[in-house]
Amino acid sequence: MSQAALRIVEGSSMDKSKALSAALSQIERQFGKGSVMKLGKNDKSMDVEVISSGSLGLDIALGVGGLPKGRIVEVYGPESSGKTTLALHAVAEAQKKGGICAFIDAEHALDPVYARKLGVNVDDLLISQPDHGEQALEIADTLVRSGAVDVLIIDSVAALVPRAELEGEMGDALPGLQARLMSQALRKLTASINKSNTMVIFINQIRMKIGVMYGSPETTTGGNALKFYASVRLDIRRIGAIKERDEVVGNQTRVKVVKNKLAPPFKQVEFDIMYGEGISKMGEILDLGVKAGIVEKSGAWFSYDSQRMGQGRENAKAFLRANPDITAKVEMAIRQNSGLIAEQILAGSPERETDDDETAED
């Protein structure tokens, strides 16, 4: 590069302005228009497009009204905690808006009957069951670069087995192979995900670190790269069972927003996942309505606008199902009071410490 190009401009702000214009025009000639621009003039960066998670409470906890498009989202938790259910609800919500969705089933465990019950249009859902991790991530890269896919699910990171591991013997030690695969793939994917405005949801599993004396021994598979590249990380846990008489009909579930680059993190929300139904919308409307003071609770009785809804939670849920007009009014009032609810669902101090430990590893 010539000395003229390296010359530092000194003097008035007019000189600096001219120098900046010259530098910007040189960058645009070399790398194309739009390589550098003022942030305020970039409309795409100002408004974050979102897709509902399928849970009203989680949409409020995320701070932007849903899961962000053009970003990487990680959903992790123990077995049978609702990770795939949450991802499929996001697919169903995207399809309702006319979006195209794809599901890379590395675990080879997707149940189309269950997906249909959650509201997923399985006839339009693209599915791939790859043979190894490299193939799965190449398929993901091609789909993202096409710009035609709105939501892409990868289930799961733990099942992305590197080709070398498949071709080797059962007892071969291959340390860090999957972590290197994920790191390389995310370096390639992250820019095209943003340009194509595709939301990529990685479902991940939990492992235990050996010899941890203080803090949480839990960690996620696939190394640390995904923790850094993800804009949103959701920790989903089953905290109890929902019973009808002696039969278990669902799970009480808690989701913590462990990382959020778009709004304040560390919020948590609880909802019911009913077997064969997914996230219970009526149960959530009832619980959030009580938190916001829209639904009154007196003992075991629930009431709205001086009208009794029923004794006990299940009876009140049945009332909401039978009265869609009242349900719509309560939901509208909850959305209008979302700021108040968001303050109330901020994680409390006993569990805040574990969240801080987890995010410190990011």
Swiss-Prot record:
PROSITE patterns: RECA_1, RECA_2, RECA_3. Keywords: ATP-binding, Cytoplasm, DNA damage, DNA recombination, DNA repair, DNA-binding, Nucleotide-binding, SOS response. InterPro entries: AAA+_ATPase (IPR003593), DNA_recomb/repair_RecA (IPR013765), DNA_recomb/repair_RecA_CS (IPR020584), P-loop_NTPase (IPR027417), RecA-like_C (IPR049261), RecA-like_N (IPR049428), RecA_ATP-bd (IPR020588), RecA_C_sf (IPR023400). The keyword Metal-binding does not apply. GO terms for cellular component: cytosol. Disulfide bonds: none annotated. The keyword Transmembrane helix does not apply. It is found in: Cytoplasm. ATP binds at G77, P78, E79, S80, S81, G82, K83, T84. Gene3D superfamilies: P-loop containing nucleotide triphosphate hydrolases. One of its GO terms (molecular function) is ATP binding. GO terms for biological process: DNA recombination; DNA repair; SOS response. Can catalyze the hydrolysis of ATP in the presence of single-stranded DNA, the ATP-dependent uptake of single-stranded DNA by duplex DNA, and the ATP-dependent hybridization of homologous single-stranded DNAs. It interacts with LexA causing its activation and leading to its autocatalytic cleavage. Belongs to the RecA family. This is Protein RecA. It comes from Nitrobacter winogradskyi (strain ATCC 25391 / DSM 10237 / CIP 104748 / NCIMB 11846 / Nb-255). The gene is recA.
